[in-house]
A protein has these predicted regions:
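Conserved SAM-binding loop
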Residues: 44-163, 180-190, 230-238
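N-terminal amphipathic/basic-hydrophobic helices that include classical n-h-c signal peptides
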Residues: 92, 247-248
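Aromatic-lined ligand-binding clefts that engage carbohydrates, nucleic acids, or primary amines
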Residues: 40
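S-adenosyl-L-methionine-dependent methyltransferase catalytic module, highlighting the catalytic core
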Residues: 2-33, 37, 65, 130-247
Length: 248
């Protein structure tokens, strides 16, 4: 697949049946399933041995810093070099005191870090920010040539949220969230930000016959229903005219 589809080349009408059909077909081809790991395990594979910028390292609270599942801890250990960013200054200072390479920077700003990275990882950040396009622009301009940006965000179509809605009647999620980012929205946000959606990934471990059974069932129903998170993969503006590298 050579980069994202630009629906505006098909029609100037965002409700065009032809444009929607083309986007639907493209997204079906862009979906990647990873059934041997969860999203954090997938992230560790992506960053291993790489120069990495990790955006949103605090994960809301210092109480996560000593947990084995703390994302930045695992990403920074797997990467060859890792710079972490967050806007919560006191917690950034605490992490610096613990020996982490972190800075207090707004990743929706025009700030220039003076470094370029093979991987930029923004884990569960995009649904919090006022300006998702600005976040993608910031991340995109800090990519090295051939680098990739990975953005994780909750999947509103997953059974996790459907079951919660059915159980509670009124859907209440993280109170700091301001958006859900579906695949079509990721495609459009990338177009507006000057980065290009390459693929979207669904990661969750399934073993043995359970994996085979689900692969069979997904022939008849949407796989997205089973996965609580999306991982969007973008490439930077400098690489948009270049041939796509295969997704890892």
């Amino acid at each position: 697949m050579n980069g994202a589809l630009d629906w505006t080349r098909i029609s100037d009408d965002p409700n065009s049946a032809a444009a929607k059909a083309a986007v639907r077909e493209w997204l079906a081809q862009a979906r990647r399933l990873h059934l041997d790991c969860d999203v954090l395990g997938f992230a560790e594979t992506l960053v291993r041995g790489r120069r990495v910028l990790d955006i949103g390292v605090v994960s809301h609270s210092a109480r996560y810093f000593d947990q084995a599942s703390w994302r930045h801890g695992r990403i920074s250990r797997a990467a060859a070099y890792c710079l972490g960013l967050d806007i919560l200054a006191p917690l950034v200072e605490e992490l610096r005191g613990r020996g982490f390479n972190v800075r207090c920077v707004d990743a929706t700003s025009d700030a220039e870090l003076g470094e370029r990275f093979e991987i930029v990882f923004a884990g569960d950040v995009i649904e919090h920010v006022d300006n998702a396009v600005a976040l993608l622009r910031f991340a995109g301009r800090h990519l090295a040539p051939g680098g990739r940006l990975y953005v994780t965000t909750p999947n509103p179509f997953s059974r996790k949220f459907f079951r919660q809605f059915r159980r509670e009647g009124v859907m209440v999620t993280n109170l700091d969230h301001v958006a859900w980012i579906s695949p079509t929205m990721a495609l459009e946000l990338g177009r507006r930000a000057g980065v290009q959606l390459e693929a979207y990934h669904l990661a969750k471990p399934y073993a043995g016959m359970n994996r085979a059974l689900h692969r069979f069932l997904w022939r008849f129903s949407a796989a997205e229903y089973a996965f609580p998170e999306f991982v969007y993969e973008f490439r930077g503006a400098a690489d948009i005219l270049e041939p796509s590298a295969p997704s890892r």
